[in-house]
C-alpha cells in the first residue's frame, strides 16, 4: 500500500509507476486473457500453408572484437548473409528464426561491461534487419541481450524480437524466467518474474504471455527451457506456432511441449567451435508438428538452414473445428497448485540500480537470501 505522505516526495515518473502498480494489484485481471468457451482470437490466414526456416550458426562474442561496434557489424553482416541465403534457397520463407544471441553472443565481467555488449530494440540493428525482412517479404525472429535506458536502466534484458514483413519491430518478447540453482552462480539477467509488478504496471497483463496474431497464424517466442507451465499458458492464450531460441536445449522438451499443447514449434540453437566443451550440445535445430513429430532437423553442430512447410489451415480445422485451445484439468489440479509455494518470490530484482547484482556470484547471494526453501 502506498502511504499518502510519501507521494509528494516521489519523482513524477516514479509516482506514476507506483500508482499503476497499486492499481494493478487491486484490479484482478482487468482484461480477458483466456476465453471461457475455449476459443481464441485470430486473424484470417493469408494462405493455408506456411514456410518456416530455422538458422543455426556460430556467433562470436562482442568482447572478442577490438570494439563493440566492430563486433556488431560483423555479427549483423553474418545474419544478413544467412537471411539472404534463406530467402534465395528452397521455398520462400514466411518466418526465419535465429538463435538466442546471434548479434551479441555472450559477455563476461561486471554488469557495466555486460551492458556494453547489448543492443536496443528497436535500434540500428533491427532497422538493418527490417530492410531485409521487407525485401524478402518475411518475418525475422531472433533473441538478444538488450538494454532499455529509459524504462529499465541498469538491467540486462533477454529479449526475443519479431520483425514484420513491413520491416518494423512487431513485438518484443521478454524472457519469462530464468533457470535456477546453477551451483555457485545464478543468471543475473532481468526477466518478467523478477520485476513482475513493475512489468505488469508498465505493459499490462496481456504482455505476460503475449501473442502476435499474424496472417500466417498466432505466434509467440520464448527462451525458457523445460518449463511446461509457461508453454501451457501460451497455448491457453491461443498460440499456434511456438518459436523457441536457445543456447543448449533438450530435443525431447521441444517435442513434448508441442505435443502437449497442440501447436507447431521451431527451435534454433547456436553452434560451438569444435574444440569447445559444449560442442556436443551445439546445433540440432528442429521444427516439429503439433504431435511432436520432427518435420525438419539438422543434428550436426554445423552451420545450417532447415525448412518445413506447415499446414496452418489444417491445424485450425483440427482444433475441434471451433478455434479451441487444448484441454487442461485446471479444476482438478487447482487445490494442489494453490498451496504450492515457489522457492523464490516475484520481484527479486526490483531493486535500486546500485543494488543490482554485478555478477552471477552476486546474483547467487541475492537468490540464497530470497529463497523460501533454503535454511537461513
What are these regions (language model features)?
Residues 150-240, 252-253:
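Active-site catalytic loop in hydrolytic enzyme cores
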Residues 13-24:
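Bacterial N-terminal signal peptides
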Residues 73, 77-174, 181, 247-263:
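Cys-nucleophile CN-hydrolase/nitrilase-fold catalytic domain and related Cys-dependent amidase chemistry
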Residues 2-15:
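Bacterial N-terminal signal peptides that target proteins for export
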Residues 28-30:
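Boundary at the C-terminal end of the N-terminal hydrophobic targeting segment
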Residues 121-141, 217-319, 324-325:
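CN hydrolase (nitrilase-like) catalytic-core segments centered on the catalytic cysteine
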Residues 41-53, 211-221:
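Beta-strand-turn-beta hairpins that frame and shape the catalytic cleft
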Residues 195-236, 315-376:
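Cysteine/selenocysteine-centered motifs that mediate thiol-based redox chemistry or coordinate metal-sulfur cofactors
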